[in-house]
């Protein structure tokens, strides 16, 4: 094959993206289909399955008991994200956790602790049996494990994982425990060095978390158009196949907004994003194409967050 033959696929892709940016002929600002179902894992205290487009994520919550109360509230909540075998094309069976998923888990944990559950520590304390409610000195705490399993990965992972985690947290409930001191004659013979034991409160009472906020994530990509237009186009919730085709030409981003429409988190990854970096933080009073594009993205993110939030509240 000569050099001209090697260039043909590149030329075809350039011609393809000149008139079509999405593989499924969907409008650039169209949201992916969203669905949610709770109570899907009987052995978890709270669970949910969420689909965003073709991406499917299952979230389950486990509760453990700590005989002490950590000073850092973030240490009471641990997020984990893993791929199931063959969750995406080209993936090996039983792959090692990728850096992308580890980074995404840290990102998810930060959003939950700082936005959705800023007062998580006060809700996870275990008090003494003789204590006077929440005014008593805590004798232990609950530790929440939020495990997200990606059944199928077609992009928009933060959109799906955050929604699944919120739905699972909202429906989570478990018996409230109290700490009782062990008798003195039993302390020396106890299997552990702890001098307290935890038992269910009488009468029975359930612990249910109260979410302070419902932050929602929206993934999008900014794709440069070919000359003579040479403009930037925003693609909302692109699939993984579309992101792979754009490669480094697209600037993939994630935007998280709360119920008041405030942007609480913004992340860029993937492409160089040179078209955005030059204009973020510039406020000279003049109207620019990138400025209007960013405002349009934020408006659409608020619209999407409102729709998904209503679905989650109705389903939980």
Model-derived segments and their meaning:
Residues 1-316:
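Polyanion-binding surfaces on beta-sheet-dominated domains and ring/shell assemblies
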């Amino acid at each position: 094959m000569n050099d001209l033959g090697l260039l043909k696929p590149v030329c075809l892709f350039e011609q393809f993206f000149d008139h079509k940016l999405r593989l499924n002929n969907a409008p650039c600002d169209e949201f992916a289909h969203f669905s949610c179902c709770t109570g899907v894992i009987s052995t978890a205290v709270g669970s949910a399955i969420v689909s965003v487009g073709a991406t499917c994520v299952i979230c389950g919550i486990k509760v453990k008991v700590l005989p002490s109360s950590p000073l850092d509230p973030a240490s009471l909540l641990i997020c984990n994200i893993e791929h199931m075998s063959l969750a995406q094309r080209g993936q090996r069976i039983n792959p090692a956790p990728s850096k992308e998923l580890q980074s995404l888990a840290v990102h998810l944990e930060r959003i939950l602790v700082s936005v959705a559950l800023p007062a998580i520590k006060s809700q996870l304390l275990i008090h003494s049996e003789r204590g006077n409610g929440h005014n008593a000195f805590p004798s232990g705490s609950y530790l929440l494990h939020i495990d997200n399993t990606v059944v199928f990965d077609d992009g928009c992972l933060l959109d799906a994982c955050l929604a699944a985690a919120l739905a699972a947290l909202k429906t989570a409930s478990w018996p409230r425990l109290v700490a009782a001191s062990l008798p003195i004659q039993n302390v020396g013979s106890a299997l552990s060095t702890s001098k307290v034991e935890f038992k269910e409160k009488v009468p029975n009472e359930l612990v249910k978390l109260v979410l302070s906020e419902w932050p929602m994530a929206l993934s999008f990509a900014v794709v440069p158009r070919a000359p003579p237009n040479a403009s930037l186009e925003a693609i909302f919730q692109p699939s993984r196949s579309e992101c792979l085709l754009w490669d480094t030409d697209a600037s993939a981003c994630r935007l998280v907004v709360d119920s008041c429409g405030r942007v609480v988190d913004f992340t860029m990854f993937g492409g160089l994003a040179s078209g955005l970096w030059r204009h973020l933080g510039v406020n000279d009073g003049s109207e620019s194409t990138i400025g209007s594009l960013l405002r349009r993205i934020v408006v659409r993110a608020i619209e999407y967050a409102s729709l998904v939030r209503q679905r989650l509240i109705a389903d939980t």
